[in-house]
Structures are given as structure tokens and as C-alpha cells.
């Protein structure tokens, strides 16, 4: 995976965040990949060209993985953390946009920093 691959995949995320008007969303990096932060807290980051890490409450994570396992999943690394993995090729922009807003709200209101 090249920097260009990551940048291209993350452009979709940035466009959806901008379209939703999510104030104070700032581009950064997290673990060497593109991320977006609010109040200096990561709410989404690119894991690879086809997967993002999206912050969310544990209860929501469990529900999302039960309802749409083809879209939402976790690896051993994320078990017990307020983050869910999202397959970008399996999610429509409308749903992804809503999840991004949820993540933005979660981190804007939550002072706890999670492993992203």
C-alpha cells in the first residue's frame, strides 16, 4: 500500500465529513495513517486502503457487528475498545456519513482517548 492509495481512500472520508459540516474536524495522522480528530481526539483513521477504524461506544459496536457483519468487524487488537473496523467497499456513503457523525459526536463529548 502506497501513500497515494491511503490518500485516495481517505479522500472519501474527508468529503463526507465536510458535507456533514462537522465543525472542528482536523486532519492528522494516527499510527502513521491519515486520521480526523475533534478536540485533539481521533474519531476516524485509515487502517489500510479498504478499512477504517471508527470510534464508537462499545454497545453500538456490538450492535453494528451483529446487524451488518459484512461491513463492521473487529480484530483481536480492538476487542474491548471503543472502536469498530469498517470495510469501505461494503458501505454506502449515506450510512458511512451517519457513522462518521456518530464518531465525531462521541469523541467531541467524550474525554477518554481510545486506541485507534
Write out the residue ranges for each language-model feature.
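Charge-dense, helix-prone N-terminal extensions
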Residues: 1-116
Amino acid at each position: 500500500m502506497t501513500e497515494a492509495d491511503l490518500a485516495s481512500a481517505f479522500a472519501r472520508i474527508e468529503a463526507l465529513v465536510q458535507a456533514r459540516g462537522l465543525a472542528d474536524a482536523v486532519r492528522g495522522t494516527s499510527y502513521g495513517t491519515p486520521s480526523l480528530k475533534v478536540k485533539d481526539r481521533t474519531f476516524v483513521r485509515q487502517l489500510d486502503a479498504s478499512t477504517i477504524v471508527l470510534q464508537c461506544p462499545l454497545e453500538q459496536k456490538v450492535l453494528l457487528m451483529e446487524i451488518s457483519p459484512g461491513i463492521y468487524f473487529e480484530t483481536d487488537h480492538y476487542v474491548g475498545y471503543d472502536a469498530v473496523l469498517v470495510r469501505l467497499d461494503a458501505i454506502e456513503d449515506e450510512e458511512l456519513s451517519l457513522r462518521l457523525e456518530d464518531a465525531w459526536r462521541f469523541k467531541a463529548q467524550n474525554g477518554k482517548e481510545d486506541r485507534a
